[in-house]
Amino acid sequence: MKPLHIVMENFGPFIKETIDFEQVETDQLFLISGKTGSGKTMIFDAIVYALYGMASTKTRKEGDLRSHFADGKSPMSVIYQFKVNNQTFKIHREAPFIKEGNITKTQAKLNIYELVDNQFELRESKVNQGNQFIVQLLGVNAEQFRQLFILPQGEFKKFLQSNSKDKQSILRTLFNSERFDEIRHLLLENVKQEKVQIENRYTQIENLWNDIDTFNNDELALYKELESSQTDKMIKKFPQFNDYGCKILKSFEEAKNKITKELDDLNHKYKVNVELSENTKKLKAEKIKFDDLKKEQNYIDKLKQELKMIQESKVLITYFTRLQSLKKDKDELVSLHEQSKLNETNYHNEIKGFQKQLEHLSTRENEITQFNQYLEKNQVFFNQLDKIISSYQQKPVIEEEIKRLYSEYNDLITKKEELTKEMNNKNKDFAIIEHYTEEIYKLKKIIDESERQKKDEKLFDKLQLDKSSYLSKLKEKKEQLNEIESSITNIDATLIDLNDKKDFVNEIKSAMSIGDTCPICGNEIHSLGEHIDFESIAQKNNKIKRLESKKVKIRDEIIKIETRIEELNHRENELNCEKQEKKDISKLQKQLNHLNQLKDEQQSINKLVENFEKQEKEIVNKIHQFDLDLSRKNTQKEKLEIQINDFERHSQFSSVNDFETYYSHAKKQVETYEYENEKTKDKLNELNNKLKIEMNDQKHLTENLTQTSKEINNLELKMEKEMQQLGFESYDQVKSAADLSAQKDEIEREINIYNKNYQSYEIEINRLKELVKGKKLLNLEKLRQSIEKTNLKLDETNSQIATISYKIDNNSNKFNKIKNIIQILDDELKVQKEIFLLSEILAGKNDYKLTLENYVLIYYLEKIIFQANQRLSFMSGNRYQLIRREAISLGLSGLEIDVFDFHSNKSRHISSLSGGETFQASLALALGLSEVVQQESGGITLDSMFIDEGFGTLDQETLETAIDTLINLKSSGRMVGIISHVSELKQRIPLILEVTSNQYESHTQFRKN
């Protein structure tokens, strides 16, 4: 990630400040300089706040970032533009605050944009989703970003000197190693659950084994004392329990069969005697009922005689019933005939009355015809009364509108003539303006070129002076280098390789004697005295090292000076200051002002003419519009006059109200007449139809009455003849016979019931006599008591059988459950054995006494130390390297850092380093950590890094080494920014971001050295 721009509003000491990081070249090192409290670190806070909504350090809260000098209505906001993976993004984050006059905070705001086709497109507009988007985009969270992007004051010294526990919390955050500890906890929890599960299974086996029934057998009871872990013995004893249970069950089933046979015999005897007792009682009851039935014989004989009489007089009764019906019909016909005669008379009278009413209506026929003609002629006007009324009302309004339009029309004509006079002798000229513009551009270009040339000449002179100074320094350094090389050449290098070989030579001397052959040169040894001055050799060797070190340093300085001279030559070539004719800038400026004045005057004339033309065009448009309006209004007036004249000519009224009253009256007269005439005609037709129907009914009634009288006479003759044959003397006797005939069905039913019951009793009594014949009745109570005793005995036996069967089945089920649990238990123990071992190893019960998480963190720490040592070796002149302390303890060991000193060839505690050495180690560790986190965070590349303070503890030489390290960083493509008060840095670093403060507000500005 590389910063491009940042805009801070009401953020710390910055009320409204913009920093353009694009002024920093791709691989340039720059310094952030300013007084204490001016807001240097706040720049980092703004970047981290824009990305993650928090400050660059944990100690600062969001509320601490808002400027104390911000007004009460403006929010604190940061707009941050940056580039990552060749994509450009812009973030606008606004902090919540309590606006002046309110009591609740405003909502936080976050908008994230991406640059697509030179336009920013919105990607996220919600705070939570936006925060997740940033983490996914950068691949690091806020804590990791703090460690990668900013090296804050004292943070890495603290990390360097911290113990394993403190380092664990930091590394855990950076490398998300909690997941490894979660794995350990999950595995441990799984092991605990599995152990509980195994214990539960043994408990289940024990409970099931204790529930096994022994059938009160002492031998089986002894088997139940086996422990739940003795599963093999349990399985071997299962068949003995089942065999003994089946043996007991068989003995009880044999006893049951014997009792069942005895019970069946008793039940059969009891059933036979119960049936005999019931049949005896039933025979006695049937005989009593049969005797009672015989007592009704006389009543039945009387009913039979009445039935015979009804059957013999059947024809006579039919004649009598028909005669009574005909007489009733005759009386009804006589009554209807008299009523019809009365109705005929009433209809004749009503018809005469309606005929007179119709004659009266015909006298108004001519009057109604005239009304109808008027209504037809003026119906269209009556239907458009509102329109006619509106025409009367609109006519004077339109006449007044026409008068007003003529007046305004004349005014516009006058105004147009006045404008035409004013526009005389005034013309637009855009060509001359273009000419003036072109001349002005040329003059400005000449002036700018002259001023630039003047500045370049001054800069060129300064570069010449700087170049001359650096050439002198270069000459001086080369002379020093030649002197050092000459000194090294003059030192006698003979025997220099024997340095540090004194002990080896003494060992050889102690093993040799005079006269022996030398193992190195092969010559005879004549003397064992001191032939080599080891102290002199060591002094020469140290002197060569010092000269070589000084030589390397001078060469580095020569390279830096040559680089600076090359840079100055490059800048001279860019300036290319050739001697040119100098222009009079003041004279050129006067010409420019004169041309601007002429251009402004012509532009004013053009604007005035355009204004006149615009007004004239508006007036012409208005005149044309007035012509259209007048034509439209006159047309409307003509239409209204035609409509009013037509109305008055046809209606013969000049008043709409009078016409409406007369038209309504005429319409009502016509409607009333038509209604009365139609109503009268309909009534006459109705009465004539009723009269015809009534006369036709009278004819039919007369015919029916004659026919009925004739039929009555014939029936009376037939009845007299039938009465003589049957011996009936009067109609009353016939009526009594007819009444008795109505009871015929009931009489027949009673006779049939009697005969049926009589026959049924005879058959049942004979059947029962056969059933009880020759049989002796036993004592039923004694039989019942014997059956109850036998049933109780059978129930007890069945209960014993059911209990034993249940116990056998229950034992079998429990045996199967125990077998299944044992099988599951065996399978689980095979699988979980390795998991139990793995859980103990991950929990720290291993040779290294390390948990899984600490083992992973040690791996990351060693990678960090490896990266850090590459820089620390350079900064310390190959003297120091960081090493991990490999002490063994439980859980949190292995994260302490020691330093290895190659001068003493020993490791020592990190706190033994001086302040400058501690800074070197901290810086190297910070850079190493940054690189490792980038490697582990999905390949995210941070193209920038900021270092906050720490250089004040360094001496001049160490400071130079630290700066060289940072220069190597920026040469790898990173933009590196440093916050420091050290004055040497201001001289060494070519680009400075100055932060200035006026007690309440700060400002920033890039400045080049």
From Swiss-Prot:
Originating species: Staphylococcus epidermidis (strain ATCC 12228 / FDA PCI 1200)
Subunit structure: Heterodimer of SbcC and SbcD.
Full protein name: Nuclease SbcCD subunit C
Residues given in the record as ATP binding sites: G34, K35, T36, G37, S38, G39, K40, T41
Nuclease listed as a keyword: yes
Protein keywords: ATP-binding, Coiled coil, DNA recombination, DNA replication, Endonuclease, Exonuclease, Hydrolase, Nuclease, Nucleotide-binding
Similarity comment: Belongs to the SMC family. SbcC subfamily.
Coiled-coil segments on the chain, per record: 397-499
Cysteine pairings via disulfide bonds: none
TM region(s), chain numbering: none
Protein role: SbcCD cleaves DNA hairpin structures. These structures can inhibit DNA replication and are intermediates in certain DNA recombination reactions. The complex acts as a 3'->5' double strand exonuclease that can open hairpins. It also has a 5' single-strand endonuclease activity.
PANTHER family: ABC TRANSPORTER ABCH.3
A GO biological process held by the record: DNA replication
Molecular function per GO: ATP binding; ATP hydrolysis activity; endonuclease activity; exonuclease activity
